Amino acid sequence: MAVAIKTQNLPLIKKIRNIPKEEMYVPGHRTCAGCGPALQYRLVAKAAGPNTIFLGPTGCMYVANASYLCTPYAVPWMHTQITNGGAVASGIEAAYKVLIRKGKWQGEFPNIIVMAGDGGAVDIGLQAMSALMYRGHDVLFVCYDNESYANTGIQTSPTTPYGGNTTFTPPGPMIPEGKKLYPKDPPQLVIGGHPAVKYVATASVAYPIDLMNKVRKALNVVGPTFLHIHAPCPKGWKTDQDKTVMLAKLAVETG
């Protein structure tokens, strides 16, 4: 029997002054200066608000955000393996449905959000993400994409662009172009293979209001949703820490 679980209607943000002042992702992390994924985490958390549970598969945002006695989350957060963010989120969503059906939970149904890097979303974690989408769980799956496995040393990932210079694809005499494979397209991958998905969008840390509104649109929908957020990485991209937003804008403008 279907259970009516979602009653919220998060309003869209029209102007900067309408951005929530309350912070759900606060100081207390160890991300690199100029970190794009940290910026997107703050924006997603602001948009989602206090009625939120975050799932963090292993990656940059787990390692830098989960120091003992010093974490930046002002809402419930749970670490998962890099392979199973989608599976853990599915279990949490199903558990809340059971509690509601049995009358053991009277509060609001929470926003359940998986915050996975490109590896945890469309590479090592692809199977669990795909299963979540296929089964129709009411979860927002965010892929924050810095185009590499930055946490473990800037190795190539499925979203590293053609010609990318990573520790696994260094340009040299034999392969001067670096990475020879073209990247996956996460939004098209989700749309093409998952008929139950209700909302898919792309966003960039360079456009915060657009990003937050897409988060809210996804959370207002009942069913699986997917957001692909482009988030430059100064360490992996070998760029100055104050150029993150500029590079993100250029990436959007150049496709």
Language-model segments: residues:
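Cofactor-binding active-site loop characterized by glycine-rich and histidine/acidic residues
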Residues: 3-141, 148-149, 154-165, 179-180
